[in-house]
Amino acid sequence: MANIVFIDNFDSFTYNLVDQFRSLGHSVKIYRNHIPAETIEQAINELENPVVLLSPGPGAPSEAGSMPELIQRMKGKVPMIGICLGHQAIVEAYGGTVAGAGEIIHGKVSMMEHQDHAIYQNLPSPLAIARYHSLVATKVPDSLTITAEVDNLVMSVVHEQDKVCGFQFHPESIMTTYGATLLGNAIEWALEKNNA
């Protein structure tokens, strides 16, 4: 079981995600992004098997309160999973660039090809995913591996060593097939090296 520290970026999807993780048997503690990174870091350090979940939210990563600072403090120390805005914040934290996607995507189902990474274990490729975003990673640093794309747009990344992964799409949406399996796989992968 993971102790999920959930960074809430004031998004309407938050409770769908929290419910999914709890139904998978994980403990979830929610911190809104106006809480100082230092406070959240102290809470993380007291937990066994912590995984930081960086939630979706409005705007750009730089506007997401304490989240960017928290990623800088915790990367390489604690596994992290970012969704939508959280994914974009991970890309920026590792030196990448996030910019306009060319169109605003709101509730669109896309067929995504993935690289059969452990996170996508036993999931079909292409996989139907739900997208809600206007920003996208336009430059991904060498330290991150792109694990899935749609129309040459980056849909997921991982940092194998740091146990950090990001999803541009919404696994918790009903429109993403196998979303619960994907989130379960991501947590399992995140905790693997943690115990090694």
Swiss-Prot record:
Pfam families in the cross-refs: GATase (PF00117)
GO terms under biological process: L-tryptophan biosynthetic process; phenazine biosynthetic process
Pathways per UniProt: Amino-acid biosynthesis; L-tryptophan biosynthesis; L-tryptophan from chorismate: step 1/5
Active-site residues from the entry: 84, 170, 172
Catalytic reactions of this protein: chorismate + L-glutamine = anthranilate + pyruvate + L-glutamate + H(+)
Main EC class the enzyme belongs to: lyase
Gene Ontology terms for molecular function: anthranilate phosphoribosyltransferase activity; anthranilate synthase activity
EC annotation from Swiss-Prot or TrEMBL: 4.1.3.27
Domain Glutamine amidotransferase type-1: 3-196
Alphabetically ordered keywords of this record: Amino-acid biosynthesis, Aromatic amino acid biosynthesis, Glutamine amidotransferase, Lyase, Tryptophan biosynthesis
Annotated binding of L-glutamine, by residue: 57-59, 88, 134-135
InterPro entries cross-referenced by the UniProt entry: Anth_synth/Amidotransfase, Class_I_gatase-like, GATASE, TrpG/PapA_dom
Matches recorded under Gene3D superfamilies: 3.40.50.880
One GO term describing the cellular component: cytosol
Keyword Calcium: no
Job of this protein: Part of a heterotetrameric complex that catalyzes the two-step biosynthesis of anthranilate, an intermediate in the biosynthesis of L-tryptophan. In the first step, the glutamine-binding beta subunit (TrpG) of anthranilate synthase (AS) provides the glutamine amidotransferase activity which generates ammonia as a substrate that, along with chorismate, is used in the second step, catalyzed by the large alpha subunit of AS (TrpE) to produce anthranilate. In the absence of TrpG, TrpE can synthesize anthranilate directly from chorismate and high concentrations of ammonia.
Record text on subunit structure and interactions: Heterotetramer consisting of two non-identical subunits: a beta subunit (TrpG) and a large alpha subunit (TrpE).
NCBIfam families, per database record: trpG_papA
Name recorded for this polypeptide: Anthranilate synthase component 2
Organism in which the protein naturally occurs: Vibrio parahaemolyticus serotype O3:K6 (strain RIMD 2210633)
Phylogenetic lineage: Bacteria, Pseudomonadati, Pseudomonadota, Gammaproteobacteria, Vibrionales
Gene (UniProt): trpG
